[in-house]
């Protein structure tokens, strides 16, 4: 098996196929309407490429203060880049196998990394060194997340368990036998009270962080592995992606799906998405509304003034209006190599940052914005 658990395909004998019962069907006219680009927007252009990693870039994480970009790779390193100049600041060494994820803590001083060496490392960015190594998982650590205070960290692993760590002394407070297959993603709610987990067993679960009690189990309508999940900022919904090329917006309190995004390709990898301010792309008032009555009005506000950045394994990004599901832009293509899959997309002001199964990190900006500014004077 290759070195980064979160980013590599499942066993070849596990074939994921489309199941018509779990897919929202659309006629050809609806599809063409939904993928129509806004006429007032002229796409994105590559601003720069960040070189340095030797293998696939598994995660891109922007610091809360928007000053730094951390990238992790299956080459076992973390690189920190300036978000102002996009120049390499430092490289952090410590893991001896691939790194699946890197996350910043509140305050932008500390960050954590999850590795295939079965450990989690806490890094002091100011000192440029690892200050703690968390051991306990018995298989690849695939995902991590800090609570808002930066006092706790939750980790998910291929050993099918979730661990909750006290970062003051590095002790494991709880070990939860959470799933029957590898855990691919964990997410803590904005208020720090809930933790969500996604697994290859096709289930997402909601946990109480303090008690470790499972509060809710969300079951996909078809038996397909999950690939990622994330709480929305308003804490009301959970975005859950699966390897049937779908992202579902769950109202987990009512146990129902209120949105399905299914125009991208995701059948092999765990991929991350992000939000992108709608202020960076002019609105087209002629955009067609979504008249599908299966989507209730109470889901319209789950992303305020933002689009959803959805990566696709064909190398493109779909900038999608979450209210109408109209694809605003799909001009970004991470690589011309058909063998390279796009894995991660992250926003930084007007910039969009992409990484994939190649060793490059690419930075993109709206073409209209680039045409008005000299590159040397253009920054987030």
UniProtKB/Swiss-Prot annotation:
Q: What is this protein called?
A: Set1 complex component swd3
Residues annotated as carrying Phosphoserine in the record are 379
Q: What does this protein do?
A: The Set1 complex specifically methylates 'Lys-4' of histone H3.
Q: Which segments carry the WD repeats?
A: 52-91, 94-133, 136-177, 179-219, 221-262, 291-330, 335-374
Which Gene3D superfamilies does its entry note? YVTN repeat-like/Quinoprotein amine dehydrogenase
Its domain of life?
Eukaryota
Q: Which GO terms describe its biological process?
A: transcription initiation-coupled chromatin remodeling
Q: Which GO terms describe its molecular function?
A: histone binding; transcription corepressor activity
Ordered alphabetically, the record's keywords are: Nucleus, Phosphoprotein, Repeat, WD repeat
Give the main location: nucleus
User: Cross-referenced Pfam families, in alphabetical order?
Assistant: WD40 (PF00400)
GO CC list: chromatin; cytosol; nucleus; Set1C/COMPASS complex
KW Phosphoprotein (keyword) present: yes
Keyword Ligase applies: no
Q: How does it assemble?
A: Component of the Set1 complex composed of ash2, sdc1, set1, shg1, spp1, swd1, swd2 and swd3.
Q: Which SMART domains match?
A: WD40 (SM00320)
User: PROSITE patterns given for it?
Assistant: WD_REPEATS_1, WD_REPEATS_2, WD_REPEATS_REGION
Q: Which PANTHER family match?
A: F-BOX-LIKE_WD REPEAT-CONTAINING PROTEIN EBI (PTHR22846:SF2), WD40 REPEAT PROTEIN (PTHR22846)
Cell compartments where the protein resides: Nucleus
């Amino acid at each position: 098996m290759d070195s980064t658990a979160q980013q590599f395909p499942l066993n070849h004998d596990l074939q994921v196929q489309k199941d018509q019962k779990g897919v929202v069907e659309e006629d050809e006219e609806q599809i063409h309407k939904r993928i129509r680009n806004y006429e007032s927007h002229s796409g994105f252009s590559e601003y720069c490429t960040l070189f340095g990693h030797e293998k696939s870039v598994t995660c891109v994480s922007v610091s809360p203060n928007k000053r730094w970009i951390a990238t992790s790779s299956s080459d076992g390193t973390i690189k920190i880049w300036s978000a102002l100049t996009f120049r390499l600041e430092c490289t952090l060494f410590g893991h001896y196998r691939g790194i699946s994820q890197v996350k910043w803590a509140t305050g932008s001083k500390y960050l954590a990394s999850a590795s295939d060496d079965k450990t989690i490392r806490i890094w002091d960015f100011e000192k440029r060194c690892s200050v703690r190594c968390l051991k306990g998982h018995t298989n690849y650590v695939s995902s991590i997340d800090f609570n808002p205070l930066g006092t706790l960290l939750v980790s998910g692993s291929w050993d099918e368990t979730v661990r909750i760590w006290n970062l003051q002394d590095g002790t494991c407070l709880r070990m939860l036998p959470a799933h029957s297959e590898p855990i691919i993603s964990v997410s803590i709610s904005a208020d720090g009270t809930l933790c969500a987990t996604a697994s290859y067993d096709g289930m997402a679960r909601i946990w109480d962080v303090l008690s470790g009690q499972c509060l809710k189990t969300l079951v996909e309508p078809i038996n397909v592995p999950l690939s990622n999940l994330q709480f929305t900022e308003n804490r009301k919904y959970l975005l859950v992606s699966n390897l049937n090329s779908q992202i579902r917006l769950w109202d987990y309190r009512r146990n129902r799906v209120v949105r399905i995004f299914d125009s991208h390709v995701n059948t092999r990898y765990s991929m991350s998405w992000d939000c992108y301010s709608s202020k960076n792309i002019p609105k087209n008032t002629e955009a067609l509304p979504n008249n599908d009555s299966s989507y209730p009005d109470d889901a319209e506000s789950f992303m305020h003034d933002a689009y959803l950045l959805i990566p696709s394994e064909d190398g493109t990004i779909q900038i999608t209006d979450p209210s109408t599901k109209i694809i605003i832009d799909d001009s970004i293509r991470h690589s011309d190599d058909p063998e390279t899959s796009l894995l991660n997309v992250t926003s930084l002001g007007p910039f969009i940052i992409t990484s994939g199964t190649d060793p490059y990190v690419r930075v993109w900006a709206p073409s209209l914005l680039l045409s008005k500014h000299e590159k040397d004077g253009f920054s987030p």
